[in-house]
Amino acid sequence: MTGTPSKLRNAALALMTLLLLLLTSCAQIPRSGPVGKSTDESAGKPNNAPVFFPVAPREGAGPESVIEDFYLAGSGYEDDYAVAREYLTQAASVAWKPDQRTLVFRSTRVVRTGVENVFNYELDVAYSVDADGIATQFPEGTKENIPVTLTQVDGQWRISAIPDGIAIPEQTFKVIYGAYPIYFYDPGFTYAVPDVRWFNKKKTVKAMTSALLSGPAPYLKGAVVSAFPSGMKLTRESVPVVSGAAQVDLSAKELVEASSEDRLRMQTQLALTFRGQPDVVNVELRANQDLVRVEDNGSVLPPVRDKNVPARQIAVNDGQLVRYENNRISPLPDIQSVGALGPVSPAESPVSQSVAFLNNSRTTLYSIVPGQPARALTTRSTLTHPSFGQQDWVWTAGPGANGATEVLAYRPTNVAEAAAMPTVTLAPAWLAGRTVKEFRVSREGVRALVISEQNGKTRVQVTGIVRNADGTPRDLTAPTTLLTDREPDQGVWVSDTTVAVMKASATDNVTPELLSLAATQPQQLAPWPGLTAISAGNGPEEIFGQSADGIFQRLGNGWSPQLKGPVDPSFPG
């Protein structure tokens, strides 16, 4: 590729980005309209949804320029990518499905192949987003080649063969796409579980509905449930919003035959999913465009979204388990002394008085319940900080007898002192060869944060917990990965979509990070010297760190001293 087309392309890219930013700052979408006003694909569109006006093919442009300009035009989604289709032959224009996949790149180049008129569009890929909005992040340097075939039509180069999908610059993606959670249920229909997707900001209501009907992302399959039966589909190509009501027209047979409870759960699931859409006030279920009545007889409780944790923390003070709350410590109610066991890393159940902790060498996991002495559950060469879920199972991870990583779960509640305790050992294939540094169950008990290491490289991942009908853990799904340039070894949940992670050090400055399922970049918190433990309550303002100088709470862009004495504070969970 010569220098001149490249310079033209860079100038066009800069102009495109400026245009997008200007449009973002000034474009206003009406929030209200006359009674009976109906919107279609624009339904639920944010006020600042941008519009990009791409450039049509230039006469006499060479093959490389046509390829580059075509992909730049892929940011222009108006009229079903009408301008981008001008770069294609008639047959290719009809066959091309731009919404099947979006590749987001950091940089690109056009590379000639050994085949005449066939080129590769080589990308340094930052993200890949599929037709259902499921995004996959890639580290810098990840390459992908898109094969492109060109031919001449009336003396002008046009693209005759190209894979479905578009490829857009990272800066453009951040402007025209947004992160939107769609919601599923835990198996007991008690909690709403977010499944964050990435959609074009102008197509959110229809896209969210289609994605919801397609089911959860791979890392949540088997861990969550949907009120919508498999195979249920939209029967219209749009989801119009009329006077604030999103009209969702579904397969008539399945909808009419569903129980009143299931229909209410369908409506609730959609309402949760649309909660961030400014044009949507309520949801109507329809069959053949006729309104289907949804009755609420009080038998179905609304699910809890973004489950809160109690304000108290459990900690260790002078070798004993204590409660830490409002910057004060008090004895842990009804729990016998465990000072002889050297407790560290304590955890408290969010739903009972069960407690777990490790011994000082972090090799033995203990549980203790009111009225009973502490009970050793397992001994390994090393174990992770215990973590409880809503189902009252306590989790840890460590090497098994053959050295391979195992994830362990125990249920100490309502077990007599001499009785066998329910126990599960899992060895998911995706953890083979890895050492787990942290395993923390999410507040609704459906997912887990897993930090693992192999050959000095760390991964921060979220997995789904698959359970039997009685709630017993059965498997951990292949996870989704949250990218960070650092090598954290500790992490905690901050909300239902965000975790805080850090690499502990008693001697160096430590910079915790917030990693979110709904963000493309980590958010670094203020550094603090010697942080060795981290805990989090409800939201980023309730993050606590511990160093040799005491406990500190995040305050704005800094840390506020709290109390010196207690160590290893941890919120229930």
Swiss-Prot record:
The keyword Chaperone does not apply. Residues 1-25 form the signal peptide. It is found in: Cell membrane. SMART domains: Germane (SM00909). Keywords: Cell membrane, Lipoprotein, Membrane, Palmitate, Signal. InterPro entries: GerMN, Lipoprotein_LpqB, Lipoprotein_LpqB_C. Transmembrane segments: none annotated. Its main location: membrane. GO terms for cellular component: plasma membrane. A lipid is attached at residue 26 (N-palmitoyl cysteine). Belongs to the LpqB lipoprotein family. This is Lipoprotein LpqB. The lineage of its organism: Bacteria, Bacillati, Actinomycetota, Actinomycetes, Micrococcales.
